[in-house]
Design a protein with these regions (language model features):
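Conserved donor-binding/catalytic core segment of Leloir-type glycosyltransferases
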Residues: 460-461, 466, 472-494, 500-505, ...
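Nucleotide-activated donor-binding/catalytic signature segment of Leloir-type glycosyltransferases, i.e.
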Residues: 401-405, 529-554, 566
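Short hydrophobic beta-strand element within catalytic cores of glycosyltransferases
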Residues: 589-592, 596-603, 610-613
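Aromatic "clamp/platform" in nucleotide-sugar-dependent glycosyltransferases that forms part
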Residues: 572
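A short, well-ordered alpha-helix in the C-terminal region of glycosyltransferases
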Residues: 628, 635, 642-657, 663, ...
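Glycosyltransferase donor-sugar binding loop
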Residues: 515-534
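Conserved acidic donor-binding segment of nucleotide-sugar-dependent glycosyltransferases
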Residues: 604-626, 635-640
């Protein structure tokens, strides 16, 4: 059907949804069964174990990364109660340093009969030393933080706060929450955020940047606008925080408090997040907590619930199951054990970790949580975990239908519940293309909170290269060679190997007048995988297509895009690639994969504000289909009439839907309606109260 034009700047007041968020009901954790007295060997499968535990803390926490599941080491039978020394962090599941936050309050006085006995740490250390279990584990965060270079420009009072720094940050209108992107790495999401900040100079911004660890990039890739007041960095891996957390696992808690933790988890699984709100205020939020939730981790009732959730699994030992739960708790602690800078709006640019921090900031400072999904991060994280192509559909049934072992099932459930919580807490959720709204609903997204708001581009900035392309189109009949460009990171998801295969098919079929340049920006804006880059180079040589596929270093791809007859996007997943917006603004057609937001950008019939239909600006084929892509590249060169239509439609589509000023007016209206600035905005116009 026809997609009607996005009307930007004409939405009524944003109000909390009157419809309660109804998450897809999933299987809750069952109540624990009575335990026999004997403690069994923790290396046995959970299906073979039912135990009596007074207090348990991890043997050797290990956990999967987003794409791998390391095996836990074999350990002997656990003593009656365990509390580890500084627990080693997992290889990629983060353990982070906290920006200064109040110390965890001591638990309130409780009746001795209801408090579980603390463990003998010295005794445990001696036992662990005999086992030799800890000595063999990698210690994350052991390097001292590198000296951080203050990044570019910003306002005269721009402040950088890294973990361990206690300086107070000023209140801002909007705190954008980023994970491993802006301002320290470039890419489509980072470019979008830079544009948002730069084109809303009447509002003040701060950046909460979630980085892997102290070795992550810390030099800005952008000239930060003057309305950026601070950058606050959170590390996901830190020895200090890991040690602090391992101590908190021994915190005394009552039976009722353990039950409160379990009730919050079980209720969230069924879509009721109110108990989790109460738990956050009572036992997690540094501003309001009166006890520590982390002590529940090592107690009998909690572990029995975990055993029950694992069911009759025979592929995970008790110690591995505990390590899994430990890492889930450690991640939450890493992100939430902090007092966040004050803002009126917390704008997360991905669900997951960034969304969780933004939701916490909104609660702490009585602000609003606004979520933008550039990609569907929950879907992508699950697909990476399960080694699937990123374009594959994911639903709430993924833990049961897609996973092959207990580790995968628990981690898939983790991502689903984290996404559902993000969607429930957000005041408004914007997506770059319509299909993303539908896909998010299958992950627990609420349609009544959804709005399609694409990225935009500045028309005037590309006027000269646009004229050059317009002058080239009438000469198509006389062309003797064609140049196609590819822009993007050298990563498997970008489909470069499949593109090289397509070129080989085309050349073997006698089509030798087409050359493809793989543009490699030298400004640090790409995040190449060295192994994959080497594979691509070797593949070009192996197929003997060096004369038809060329690697070209460029400072900025937009500076040379006018030299090319088409942009090829062979990816397995894309939302709305900025390179495609640049190409279309010059009138350069797009060919590539039918994934993500590419259909909305390139092929779906649109209708502008005057109800005039706008056709395709190129053609797309299934991802990974090298033969179809070879045919499409040849087709581009064989019909001047089709090429002219794609050229004209590219310009028309940009003018109708993707101009930056209209997109930025909508962002400004959203921010103000959520409480930023001094005036409320309705329909893009400021309304003085």
């Amino acid at each position: 059907g026809v997609i009607k034009p996005l009307i930007i700047g004409h939405q009524a007041d944003l109000k909390p949804s009157t419809n309660p968020f109804s998450a897809i009901v999933r299987q809750p954790l069952a109540s624990p069964e009575p335990e026999p007295e004997a403690m069994q060997d923790p290396t046995l499968g959970v299906a073979e174990v039912s135990e009596s535990v007074t207090q348990v803390t991890p043997t050797v926490p290990t956990s999967p990364t987003a794409s791998t599941v390391p095996e836990a080491p074999e350990v002997p039978a656990a003593p009656d109660s365990l509390t580890p020394p500084a627990a080693p962090a997992p290889a990629r599941i983060p353990t982070a340093a906290t920006t200064p936050a109040p110390a965890v309050p001591e638990a309130p006085p409780v009746k001795p009969s209801k408090v579980r006995k603390p463990v003998d740490v010295d005794k445990l250390k001696a036992e662990l030393s005999e086992w030799g279990a800890w000595a063999s584990m990698p210690q994350l965060g052991s390097k001292k933080p590198q000296d951080k270079k203050k990044s570019k420009v910003g306002g005269p009072s721009l402040v950088y706060r890294f973990p361990g720094d206690s300086q107070v940050l000023q209140e801002v209108d909007i705190a954008v929450v980023m994970e491993s992107t802006y301002p320290f790495t470039a890419g489509d999401t980072a470019v979008s955020v830079q544009n948002i900040i730069r084109h809303n100079p009447d509002l003040t911004f701060g950046v909460i940047h979630i980085a892997d660890n102290s070795n992550a990039p810390a030099k800005s890739m952008f000239e930060l606008p003057a309305n950026v007041k601070w950058v606050d960095v959170i590390y996901l891996e830190s020895t200090e925080v890991s040690e602090k957390f391992s101590g908190l696992v021994s915190s005394p808690v009552t039976d009722e408090q353990v039950r409160e933790v379990l009730d919050a988890i079980e209720s969230s699984v069924t879509g009721n997040h109110e108990p989790m709100h109460a738990l956050y205020e009572n036992a997690i939020n540094p501003q309001t907590r009166t006890w520590s939730a982390w002590g529940a981790l090592g107690h009998r009732e909690f572990m029995n619930a975990a055993i029950k959730a694992a069911g009759k699994a025979d592929d995970i030992s008790l110690s591995q199951l505990f390590d899994l739960a430990y890492n889930f708790f450690l991640r939450i602690y890493t992100l939430l054990d902090r007092v966040l800078p004050t803002a009126r709006v917390y704008h997360a640019h991905s669900s997951g970790n960034a969304g969780l921090v933004a939701a916490a900031g909104a609660v702490q400072n009585k602000g609003k949580f606004f979520l933008t999904e550039h990609n569907l991060n929950i879907r992508d994280s699950i697909n990476k975990l399960l080694s699937r192509d990123l374009n594959r559909r994911v639903t709430s049934e993924a833990p049961l239908k897609l996973t092959t072992d207990t580790f995968e099932r628990f981690w898939t459930q983790w991502w689903l519940e984290l996404g559902a919580l993000n969607y429930a807490e957000a005041e408004l959720i914007t997506y770059l293309y319509p299909q993303a709204v539908t896909d998010a609903q299958e992950l627990g997204g609420a349609q009544e909170k959804a709005e399609v708001l694409p990225d935009g581009i500045e028309w005037e900035d590309l006027e000269i290269p646009r004229i050059w392309r317009q002058q080239a189109v009438p000469k198509l009949e006389r062309k003797i060679s064609w140049k196609l460009a590819v822009v993007g990171d050298f990563q498997p998801s970008k489909g470069i190997i499949e593109l090289i295969d397509a070129v080989k098919i085309m050349v073997d079929g006698g089509k030798t007048d087409v050359r493809v340049d793989l543009l490699k920006p030298t400004d640090g804006s790409t995040t190449d995988e060295p192994e994959y880059y080497s594979r691509c180079v070797a593949h070009i040589k192996q197929l003997s297509v060096e004369n038809y596929v060329r690697l070209r270093d460029v400072k900025d791809a937009r500076d040379v895009m006018h030299e090319y007859d088409a942009l090829v996007v062979p990816s397995f997943q894309e939302s709305q690639p900025h390179a495609a917006l640049v190409a279309m603004t010059m009138g350069v057609p797009i060919i590539g994969s039918s994934v993500g937001g590419m259909n909305a950008l390139v092929t779906e019939e649109l209708s502008d504000a005057q109800h005039k239909k706008i056709g395709a600006s190129g053609e797309l084929v299934p991802p990974g289909d090298s033969a179809a892509l070879a045919t499409l590249m040849a087709k581009l060169t064989q019909s001047p009439e089709l090429y002219r239509a794609w050229h004209e439609n590219a310009l028309a589509r940009i003018k109708a839907f993707y101009l930056l000023p209209q997109v930025m007016r909508r962002y400004n209206a959203i921010y103000r309606n959520l409480g930023a600035g001094k005036h409320k905005v309705i329909g893009g116009m400021a309304m003085v109260p």
